[in-house]
Amino acid sequence: LVRYYGRMGYNTKNLIGSINVDPIKNMLLKGKALTREQVATKIAETVKAAKALVNYRVVGVNSVVLNNSGAYAAQELAYALAWGAEYMTMLTEAGVANYKAANAIRFNMGIGGNYFMEIAKFRAGRMLWAKIVEAYKAPIFTTALRNAAKMNVSAETSRFNMTIFDAYVNLLRTQTETMSAAIAGVDEITVTPFDATYEQPTDFSERIARNQQLLLKEEAHFDKVVDPAAGSYYLENLTASIAAEAWKQFLAIQEQGGMY
């Protein structure tokens, strides 16, 4: 990709994007066993190969696969944090600077059907991920690491709760899920077409999925306010509750050796 951009004459410093390299996800979905050393080598080589793409995030944490398997909000968040922390450890052990390691990681998370719970999940995630990244300071918490501590999230509407019967009802589910993610301030949203559970999405269903986001942006103006949930007693309290439960589960995972 770097060579291609070079041949095309692009300035790689001006390019923004992501590459979803995630060996742990492949193991979860395909059952192929990889050693910790193999995973660490894969992601470290990916980050080093993409060093010219300074605004690219090349390592993915795909907890969306857990969401699509029925994981609840705090559970998905806990495993996503443990997943990300594992990659942070692998990268820093491979000699990648802490802030570069944090900047390389992108979270691909699912959006469940519990409207307020999902808003709280993403808000809690930003807080807890910053706490984890801060633990990698060596020997001081530099400005670069502080800036890199912001959780980058791509959210995808869940497939777990979609029905094949009266599939247009899925539009209601995906619309409220999209609203949850937008209010929570994620960086990117993917709306699953309403017919994706039983057929290859059609041109019509894909167009509707795109328009669902445009409605929230252009007509509801969901892109105009930063953290619109801030100050709401209910959402602030729910965010704290989700954060506490997710952190408890995260620590339990770490006590058992982390994702490996």
Place the predicted regions along the sequence by residue.
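Short glycine/threonine-rich loop-to-helix capping motif typified by GTGT followed
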Residues: A71-L77, G112-A124, S158-L171, E199-A209, ...
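Catalytic alpha/beta active-site cores
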Residues: L1-N114, P139-S154, A182, E188-T192
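Long amphipathic alpha-helical segments
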Residues: A85, T92, A124-A144, N170-E188, ...
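Active-site or pore-adjacent capping/gating segments
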Residues: T176-M179, V186-Y260
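Short polybasic/polar patches that bind polyanions
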Residues: G6, E134, Q254
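Glycine-rich beta-alpha junction loops
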Residues: V65, W129, D195
